[in-house]
Amino acid sequence: MNDKKELKLILVAARNQLSSNDIKSLIAYLESDDCEFEISLQISEPTEQPELLELHRLVAIPALIKVSPAPKQIFAGSNIFSQLQKWLPRWTQEGLTKNLGINLQPSKIDSIRTQKEFLLEDELLVLRQENETLTKRIESQERLLRMVAHELRTPLTAATLAVQSQKLGQIDISKLQEVIKRRLEEIELLSQDLLEVGTTKWEALFNPQKIDLGNISAEVILELEKFWRLRNIEIDTDIPSDLPSVFADQRRMRQVFLNLIENAIKFSRDSGSIKITMIHKTNQWVEITICDKGAGIPLSEQKRIFLDRVRLPQTSEGTSGFGIGLSVCRRIVQVHGGRIWVVSEVGVGSCFHFTVPVWQGQNKEQQYLTKG
């Protein structure tokens, strides 16, 4: 025989509020055997039942309404569960004390005061949440600005090298014009990114399509030829002829290759070697590896180098640099749904690995793009 008193409740909350710890704890308790009442709980979405707000004169949500037994009582704010726990023992005693004339019901004045307190508490909570959101947005915009500024360096450097090569007679005027035109187009695209920083999410700036990573890596190697030939560095590639195309943003993938190969050249010893390998490990991903025989990276630094504003370790030749390029690589790869990591040993060298999704006829609804 069930001797529990029936308690009819209505929980008015938005969908996102139902995932808060307070509301989850409240629902779990009401559905458990620990509750001393026979609970009838109705969960209502205010946008679907706006009449509840007027009917119960709710001034804030989430709100828990005790419909029966009478009188009606309302709890609101971010600590509804703890409020309910304070009142449950009093409701339990109501039946025992009713015949003695003891009134344990909240007065109207107390109820109004409590509602105002809850409203102020909720407004403070909203202000804190808005402040956190604004702070995160500013940080995201600053990070994106640093990335775009870093990317601007690449076409500017390439254009400068082309001008120098033309002066030395290594390329003719038509080739110089072609290079300058292509680099100006890249700068124009980057300037568009800058204009969209305040209104666009990082992943929305990507345009994934079917691309050939082998061709992209070959273009980057040629673009950096002056740097690796000057230091007598040999670059070997191991790319299968049947390597599938991938689904990625061509400009961003080129940036990843530029950053990683440029770093490999920068931190390699003179007359050293760099190897670029691509393998089709599964039907979902292509894995790219870029290895050098440079100074290597200490184990303690290997997890940090992909973070913003981290300085790479110094080589024996005194070369050092900021790791924003690796941060850019990490975010680009992650937006495509892939992974990037490093395997390195001090004095032996470093191998940077990253994965890119295979082209499988993806359309806009099947994109791998995620938040970076």
From Swiss-Prot:
Name the InterPro entries on file.
HATPase_C_sf, His_kinase_dom, HisK_dim/P_dom, HisK_dim/P_sf, KaiB_domain, Kinase_SasA, Light-responsive_reg, Sig_transdc_His_kin-like_C
Give the protein's biological function: Member of the two-component regulatory system SasA/RpaA involved in genome-wide circadian gene expression. One of several clock output pathways. Participates in the Kai clock protein complex, the main circadian regulator in cyanobacteria, via its interaction with KaiC. KaiC enhances the autophosphorylation activity of SasA, which then transfers its phosphate group to RpaA to activate it. In addition to its output function, recruits fold-shifted KaiB (KaiB(fs)) to KaiC to cooperatively form the KaiB(6):KaiC(6) complex (independent of SasA kinase activity).
Q: Which UniProt keywords apply?
A: ATP-binding, Biological rhythms, Kinase, Nucleotide-binding, Phosphoprotein, Transferase, Two-component regulatory system
Q: What reaction gets catalysed by this protein?
A: ATP + protein L-histidine = ADP + protein N-phospho-L-histidine
Sequence ranges assigned to domain Histidine kinase in this UniProt record: 147-360
Q: Which GO terms describe its molecular function?
A: ATP binding; phosphorelay response regulator activity; phosphorelay sensor kinase activity; protein kinase activator activity
Phosphohistidine-modified residues are H150
Q: Does the keyword Kinase apply?
A: yes
Q: What is its EC number?
A: 2.7.13.3
Determine if Chaperone is one of this entry's keywords.
no
**Can you say what this protein is called?**
Adaptive-response sensory kinase SasA
Assembly and partners are described as: Homooligomerizes. Interacts with KaiC. Participates in the KaiBC complex, whose core is composed of a KaiC homohexamer and 6 KaiB.
Record text about domains: The N-terminus interacts with KaiC, while the C-terminal histidine kinase domain autophosphorylates and is probably responsible for self-oligomerization. The N-terminal domain stimulates the C-terminus to autophosphorylate.
Biological process GO annotation list? circadian rhythm; osmosensory signaling via phosphorelay pathway
